[in-house]
Amino acid sequence: MNIRERLGKELLFLDGGMGTLLQAEGLAPGELPETWNIEHPEKVEAIHRRYYEAGSDVVLANTFGANVCKFHDDRYTVEEVIRAGIANAKRAGEQIGKETYVALDMGPTGKLLKPMGDLDFDDAYEAFAEAVRYGEKYGADLIHIETMSDTYEVKAAILAAKENSSLPVFVTMIFDERGKLLTGGDVPSVVAMLEGLRVDALGLNCGLGPKQMLPILNDLRRYTSLPIIVKPNAGLPKQKNGETYYDVEPDEFARIMQEVVKEGACVIGGCCGTTPEHIKKLVEECKDLPLRKIEKKHDTIVSSYGQAVILDDMPRIIGERINPTGKKKFKEALKNEDMDYILKEAITQQDKGAHILDVNVGLPDIDEVAMMEKVVKELQSVTSLPLQIDTVDGKAMERAMRIYNGKPMINSVNGKQVSRDEVFPLVRKYGGVVVGLTIDEEGIPKDAEGRVRVAGKIINEAAKYGIDKKDIVIDVLTMTISSEKDGAKVTLEALKRVREEFGVRTVLGVSNISFGLPRRPIVNSYFYAMAMQNGLTAGIINPSSEDMMKAYRSYNALMGFDENCTNYISTYAGTTETVTVQASQAAAAAGNAPKAAGVEMTLKYAIERGLKEEAHHITRDLIGTREPLDIIQEELIPALNVVGEGFEKGTVFLPQLLMSADAAKIAFAVIKDVLASSGQEEEKKEKIILATVKGDIHDIGKNIVKVLLENYGFDVIDLGKDVPPEAIVEKAVEENVTLVGLSALMTTTVVSMEETIKLLREKKPDCKVMVGGAVLNQDYADMIGADFYGKDAMQSVHYAQKFFGMVE
């Protein structure tokens, strides 16, 4: 029986940890676990068999790191270790006496994807695609993508799985206790994207014990209509007599996992620290528990990598300004590939209150496919707002949907057969919330009845592609009243009927209503209020228009969406009514965007927003009037502090943090060149060594820490990954370094971290050690003798500043 037929109908049991069991069998630090598929197949097979005997329905082949980005061994190819890994798992299940399944286990590449790192999305896709092809070729029953902390990387993996096999796809992500991914994603944004990509089951693994996963499981159940997978660690890692162990024993693990099943999980197993004993007890205690019914959810959600916007009864704003129509300067920016101009438009709208940004780059004389990809990627590096892909070019639409990190809005499909045939397959494949325009082969219906009819046709045709109506928003079209006197009445009637008759969400390009009229914002704002009252979910407007925002804020206050009128009061308390048109509003009417939401474009602002070109130009201008070191202390460092504080509070996400760091790096480079040409010396930089310890090839966290430390003025000596203790100590002595940062992602390599600390204490006793990594916590850091544990990159910066006396 295909595992899809059992999903959600019965409780399925996965296996537990592999790495610690291999280590117990003799796997040496730094040795690639996948090589044991070939060199010690009997030991790998025995571990799989123990899990099957414990009651696992599914075991994961020993292929977690089998991709070209991570697996580097001169003796064996990726194909060879996958073939052997699947064969070992299959042999283990042959004599079990029940139906068993083997999953191709796909872990992360160990690299950050662009723009945060240096791995291209297409290269990540190819790495996963190769593994998938071999997995299906050699008999895997399903693909399990696990321990993912980046939605962009997991999207590459899912597309690789879907496009290169017909196997079921399970996906589990690694969340922290706040319910956040490393790159900032939360539960609703992750669910929106994974469901859009049509995985078979989703959930969480690693990082946390079963008790800590319960709140996140509840969030998953709130948003997903899919079967939920839960694979916790056996609690928290500890050390005793030089051995790593986890603090949740099999009995306690099984007891808590009963709660996990009652709260909605229907595929369960274990991750780090769990053993066949944990799984045996898990099966004994949970096998007879009834499954909680999976409830179908009806939320209309669009998302970015770090933010979900739920289109519900409270109206939302779609910013209209990233569009060349009627905007001379924007057209020039597109032709000249002036990304900073476009990014400032995005930041302006975000600051003014937009929830989603419309993105249209259509010009006759540009390569729209390439430009759309470039603009989408650049926008996602500076804003966490979801995007609406606005194009009539099918190729541009597909490329944007493919490389977009999240679940976008798609603008648009219409009632014409040719449009439906082009757009609906893309929405089915990549996921998205698609805008349905009420126009068909007969044109735009003149009356509300006709537009409602076309809306119904779009919804019904979408269903044939498996697209639920929650992923459709209907645009009944706004016709200008200067040429159609009943245009507003027809639109409002159609709007209301679509909401009432189909129960779908709605969208309108509001400002179309006033073309050809004077003082357009007056008409626009009144029509906007009327549209919201008649069921408008999302208005495509200019959020820099004060008239429109007054209508929006007033409506929300009057309808109770703005609880206690908090937003209205915070915006208007202490202000007075004025008859003058604001500068930003006047600029918008003229087709020229304000510079940056009415904020003076300072170096500090440019760095906070990750505007690299602006940072370069402003720094060059400042050099002529201010001392270089004053610029660093008064502009650069305060800007980095603001971004760092936002990151710690969860209001700034990792991509924005790193883009700000890049902007600061460019400004630093300008200052450094000036100092060098004038014969001045830079201030002496304190040295810090960073290294991922012996046996560990994951250096994402270390690289993030490096970027931030360098921007705060430290001289970072990066020794790379898989670094022996002796090499770290030798460099510390040679360079007389007094602070070393060590990173480890894998439980099995924390022993190397402890050995490194002991050797540093012996050979360089004045050297302090800060540690970080997914498997660590404060207790564990204390046990291995570290001086400081940093749960994120900014904490490492703070410790370094205090250690060197840069702050109190």
Task: Enumerate the language-model features and the residues they cover.
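Domain-level signal for soluble alpha/beta catalytic cores
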Residues: M1-D475, M479-E808
